[in-house]
């Protein structure tokens, strides 16, 4: 009777061990993965959906302005001396409107951003502060004419003197709120013969920074009004229901699956990555070396490079940051050659130096982007200034902390600086003596950091996953112990063959009877 129970115990233990091994190696990971996918995919029933549709907390949007402190000296050929003023802090609210779902596991949506000035975070700074900055819109206009039709530069400049009020030099004295959102009024009601040409061009194809005035006689120039309370897109994004590894990937923008701003090159024109709000979980066995995001403001995808695994908010995370390769010159990174656009400037082939990006193909204006204070850019850019430019990795780099299990952004900062060339043009009185160089206007810092409530939710999820992991290995351990105990019991009861102690003979215990004969081999 005991032998029968022992054999049964052994059989059950062996089956339990096999089942436990399958569960530990495949079952539990599959169940957990499916549950995570169910929670984070873009679906009306998922936990993530509403947080994705309407971000539950505001992002930070900080603006730093480069105030010019020696205007008269610069007008006479001296190096510019700059003073950084900021941050002018804003709360940025984001809300998406779902337009529909595609058969290929996609969702189409528009994104609306709303900016509200945050006086507390801005400290003593006010939107009514007056600053002196490079006249971005004037320089954009005169550079475009000078590059495309240099012979009429002087004539067009005469029209611009009526278009822009008090145009005595290439600098703008302006209130911060007008520069950012409210707008600086420019006039189309003058009588200069070339003014109709300038305003006609704007009416037909105005850049994003110019919006028509209500009186019909002019425009308002501002850096960010086109982003405020207006819907961008539509975007088409993969929902992650069929393949969680593709979650968040942007496959089209404004109906285009390829950005032709950079020609027909597949590398520069492809849409790669997410909109930086959502990422797929990270496979710990195959951690991506680059994290791509699609940036509509520059009409291209950018990437941050993996630095390593880190810890933030007492949780493990993968840390990515912008590296020098992303904005490298074509000599340092030949892959960036397709971002050169020869047709926009008569002065060079469009291949800019290290650390800066030509925005002309994207914005139809000769603007140039960089990291703040020309961080990771060529040092020759710094030599143009008499002070006020001091690149610092901690203050000026772009980075992101990504939680691997869910792909949630724990913390991230995107930093970008807008620049334009200040060019010496002898035929233009306002530019006849100025030194030529790349001049910064301002830089932005857009950031997200999860609130405590969501961090607690993540920690609870991690705790639950820890319990599941403990159960997974506990069941396997119990099955191993039970199988070992039952195997020993079976062996001791004589139900399985054993090797005898006598090295010169082999015996087989065929039954549990103690008086069984032992056959000896001589």
From Swiss-Prot:
Detected in both male and female antennal tissues. Expression is two to three fold higher in male compared to female antenna. Detected at low levels in all body tissues except the female abdomen. Its main location: membrane. InterPro entries: CD36_fam. It is a multi-pass membrane protein. Disulfide bonds join 268-338, 299-362, 340-351. It is found in: Cell membrane. One of its GO terms (biological process) is sensory perception of smell. It holds the Pfam family CD36. The chain crosses the membrane at residues 8-28, 470-490. Signal peptide: none annotated. It comes from the Eukaryota. Glycans are attached at residues 44, 67, 104, 166, 191, 228, 272, 314, 343. Residues 29-469 are extracellular. GO terms for molecular function: scavenger receptor activity. One of its GO terms (cellular component) is cytoplasm. Keywords: Cell membrane, Disulfide bond, Glycoprotein, Membrane, Olfaction, Receptor, Sensory transduction, Transmembrane, Transmembrane helix. Residues 1-7, 491-522 are cytoplasmic. Plays an olfactory role that is not restricted to pheromone sensitivity. Belongs to the CD36 family. This is Sensory neuron membrane protein 2. It comes from Ostrinia furnacalis (Asian corn borer).
């Amino acid at each position: 009777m005991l032998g029968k129970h022992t054999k049964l115990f052994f059989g059950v233990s062996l089956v339990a061990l096999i089942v436990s091994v399958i569960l530990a190696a495949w079952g539990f990971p599959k169940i957990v993965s499916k549950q995570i996918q169910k929670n984070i995919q873009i679906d009306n029933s998922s936990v993530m959906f509403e947080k994705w549709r309407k971000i539950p907390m505001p992002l930070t949007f900080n603006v730093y302005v480069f105030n010019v402190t020696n205007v008269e000296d610069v007008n006479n050929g001296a190096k510019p001396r700059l003073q950084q003023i900021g941050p002018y802090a804003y709360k940025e609210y984001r809300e998406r409107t779902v337009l529909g779902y595609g058969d290929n596991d996609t969702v189409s949506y528009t994104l609306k951003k709303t900016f509200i000035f945050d006086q507390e975070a801005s400290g003593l700074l006010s939107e009514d502060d007056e600053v002196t900055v490079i006249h971005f819109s004037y320089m954009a206009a005169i550079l475009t004419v000078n590059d495309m039709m240099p012979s009429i530069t002087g004539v067009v400049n005469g029209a611009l003197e009526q278009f822009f009020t008090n145009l005595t030099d290439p600098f703008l004295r302006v209130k911060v709120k007008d520069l950012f959102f409210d707008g600086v009024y420019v006039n189309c009601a003058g009588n200069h013969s070339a003014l109709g040409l300038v305003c006609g061009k704007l009416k037909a194809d105005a850049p994003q920074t110019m919006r028509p005035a209500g009186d019909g006689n002019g425009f308002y120039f501002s850096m960010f009004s086109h982003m405020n309370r207006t819907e961008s897109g539509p975007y088409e994004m993969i929902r992650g229901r069929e393949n969680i590894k593709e979650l968040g990937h942007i496959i089209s923008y404004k109906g285009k699956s390829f950005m032709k701003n950079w020609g027909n090159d597949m590398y520069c024109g492809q849409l790669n990555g997410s909109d930086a709000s959502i990422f797929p979980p990270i496979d710990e066995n195959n951690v991506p070396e680059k994290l791509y995001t699609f940036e509509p403001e520059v009409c291209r995808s950018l990437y941050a490079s993996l630095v390593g695994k880190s810890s933030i908010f007492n949780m493990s995370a993968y840390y990515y940051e912008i590296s020098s390769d992303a904005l490298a010159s074509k000599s340092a990174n030949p892959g960036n050659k397709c971002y050169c656009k020869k047709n926009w400037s008569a002065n060079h082939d469009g291949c800019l130096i290290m650390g800066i990006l030509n925005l002309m193909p994207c914005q139809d204006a000769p603007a140039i982007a960089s990291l703040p204070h020309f961080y990771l850019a060529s040092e020759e850019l710094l030599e143009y200034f008499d002070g006020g430019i001091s690149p610092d990795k901690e203050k000026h780099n772009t980075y992101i902390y990504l939680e691997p299990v869910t792909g949630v952004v724990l913390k991230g900062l995107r930093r970008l600086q807008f620049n334009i060339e200040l060019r010496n043009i002898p035929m233009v009185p306002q530019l006849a003596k100025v030194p030529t160089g790349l001049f910064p206007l301002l830089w932005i810092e857009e950031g997200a950091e999860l609130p405590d409530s969501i961090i607690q939710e993540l920690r609870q999820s991690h705790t639950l996953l820890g319990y599941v992991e403990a159960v997974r290995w506990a069941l396997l351990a119990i099955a191993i112990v039970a199988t070992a105990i039952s195997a020993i019991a079976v062996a001791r009861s004589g139900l399985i063959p054993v090797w005898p102690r006598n090295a010169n003979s082999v015996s087989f215990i065929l039954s549990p009877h103690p008086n069984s004969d032992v056959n000896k081999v001589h």
